[in-house]
Amino acid sequence: MPIHLEIVTAERVILSDDVDMISVPTKDGRVGILPRHAPLMTILEPGELDIIKNGERTPFAVSGGFMEVLPHRVTILADTVERADEIDEARAEQARAEAEARRREAQSEHDMALAEAKLRKEMVRLRVAQLHKIKRRQS
């Protein structure tokens, strides 16, 4: 019996499908969600979101957000989320370099926090894209 997953951003519905398992990065570490999971509401951290369906793993890069889990449905409200195969690695690398430069030049704690958050997001995007590229080569 699958669990229904909806991944939504402010711009669009990214995914609405029945899946076998979801693995997400939360404030308390990675959490795996299977059908009939206990109800849960949690904050998502930037990281790799994995969906398993019919034995196939589909990775996404998520920049943060919230997740609501009910026994037969999961709703993820993400700040941003991208499928691994949609990530432009060159643009992500450029954004990472810009975030590092902003961090070095930060004049206040607020500027530093913003630059570090952007840097974390871009590092996640790069890691997910690179892992996807390795997986494709092995297939």
From Swiss-Prot:
Membrane topology: Peripheral membrane protein
Keyword Transport: yes
Subcellular location: Cell membrane
UniProt region (Disordered), positions on chain: 89-110
GO CC field: plasma membrane; proton-transporting ATP synthase complex
SUPFAM superfamilies the record matches: Epsilon subunit of F1F0-ATP synthase C-terminal domain, Epsilon subunit of F1F0-ATP synthase N-terminal domain
GO molecular function annotation: ATP binding; proton-transporting ATP synthase activity, rotational mechanism
Superkingdom assignment: Bacteria
Principal subcellular localization: membrane
Matching InterPro entries: ATP_F1_dsu/esu_C_sf, ATP_synth_F1_dsu/esu, ATP_synth_F1_dsu/esu_N, ATP_synth_F1_esu_C, ATPsynth_dsu/esu_N
Keyword tags: ATP synthesis, Cell membrane, CF(1), Hydrogen ion transport, Ion transport, Membrane, Transport
Oligomeric form and interacting partners: F-type ATPases have 2 components, CF(1) - the catalytic core - and CF(0) - the membrane proton channel. CF(1) has five subunits: alpha(3), beta(3), gamma(1), delta(1), epsilon(1). CF(0) has three main subunits: a, b and c.
Protein function: Produces ATP from ADP in the presence of a proton gradient across the membrane.
Similarity comment text for this entry: Belongs to the ATPase epsilon chain family.
Protein name: ATP synthase epsilon chain
